Regions:
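A short, N-terminal "cap"/entry segment at the start of jelly-roll beta-barrel domains
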Residues: 1-36, 115-118
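Conserved short histidine dyad/triad with adjacent acidic residue
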Residues: 23, 39-53, 88
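Short hydrophobic/aromatic-rich beta-strand segments that constitute the beta-sheet cores
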Residues: 26-27, 38, 69, 103
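Short, charged/polar surface micro-motifs in flexible loops or helix N-caps
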Residues: 33-36, 43-47, 66, 109-112
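Short, conserved beta-strand element in jelly-roll/cupin
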Residues: 42-44, 53-69
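Short beta-strand His + acidic residue motifs that chelate non-heme Fe in jelly-roll/DSBH
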Residues: 49-51, 69-70, 91-98
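Short acidic-glycine-tyrosine-enriched beta hairpin
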Residues: 73-88
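Ligand-binding loop in jelly-roll beta-barrel domains
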Residues: 88-113
Length: 118
């Protein structure tokens, strides 16, 4: 068993063309898992990711702030304690809408992300 405390996890800049701004950091929680990825993503005010999809399910667990998780059909506000299941292949985005926002994402290790928006 391994227990990780989020506040003790190293925060690093998360530069990626998937994001609409540069104020994004991440904290990899379980780097030695063979099957799962569990990472905290911290979005600065107004930063989100662009429309994308995954080839497996993704779970988001909101840990701070208020944000939005959106598909082509709807935008849902989310806040501390909300848990979101995004099915494989669903076009979506998530991020901050006016204040800093953080979530943990959990997905299958080695899964493929496809960016669907420039």
């Amino acid at each position: 068993m391994k227990v990780v405390t989020i506040k003790d996890s190293k925060k690093e800049t998360f530069s990626n063309p998937l994001f609409t701004g540069s104020d994004v950091t991440r904290q990899v929680l379980i780097p030695d898992s063979r099957e799962l990825v569990a990472t905290v993503v911290n979005f600065g005010k107004g930063v989100r990711n662009k429309f994308h999809s995954h080839d497996c399910e993704q779970i988001l667990i909101v840990t701070a702030g208020r944000g939005v998780v959106a598909t082509e059909k709807e935008e849902r506000p989310v806040t501390l304690g909300d848990v979101v299941l995004i099915p494989a292949g669903e076009k979506h985005w998530h991020g901050s809408v006016g204040e800093p926002f953080s979530h943990i994402y959990v997905s299958k290790s080695g899964s493929k992300l496809t960016q669907l928006e420039d």
